[in-house]
Swiss-Prot record:
Belongs to the bacterial ribosomal protein bS20 family. The keyword Nuclease does not apply. GO terms for molecular function: small ribosomal subunit rRNA binding; structural constituent of ribosome. GO terms for cellular component: cytosol; small ribosomal subunit. This is Small ribosomal subunit protein bS20. It comes from Corynebacterium aurimucosum (strain ATCC 700975 / DSM 44827 / CIP 107346 / CN-1) (Corynebacterium nigricans). The gene is rpsT. Keywords: Ribonucleoprotein, Ribosomal protein, RNA-binding, rRNA-binding. The keyword Nucleotide-binding does not apply.
Length: 87
């Protein structure tokens, strides 16, 4: 543990942020995985719905500072491409 009071506080706040970011990141990954499963199953309606849900989750994570906006844009672009390639 750090000796300086401000560093002790930073350790606590960093841990809180880490836990919060971890849960948000996990939720986003879950939504992306559900989208990929829908695409793999060939279910266009479910994939379209899940694309919207995953894109929204990515946008929210960007506003919370979990993902960089370019990272989210790349992920959304990849999902849109995968969706458009569906027959």
């Amino acid at each position: 543990m750090a000796n300086i009071k401000s560093k002790q506080k930073r350790i606590l706040t960093n841990e809180k942020s880490r836990q919060r970011n971890k849960s948000v990141r996990s939720a986003v990954r879950t939504e992306i995985r559900k989208f990929r499963e829908a695409v793999a199953a060939g279910d266009k309606a479910a994939a379209e719905k899940q694309l919207r849900v995953a894109s929204r989750a990515l946008d929210k994570s960007v506003s919370k500072g979990v993902f960089h906006r370019n990272t989210a844009a790349n992920k959304k672009s990849g999902m849109a491409t995968a969706f458009n390639k569906m027959a």
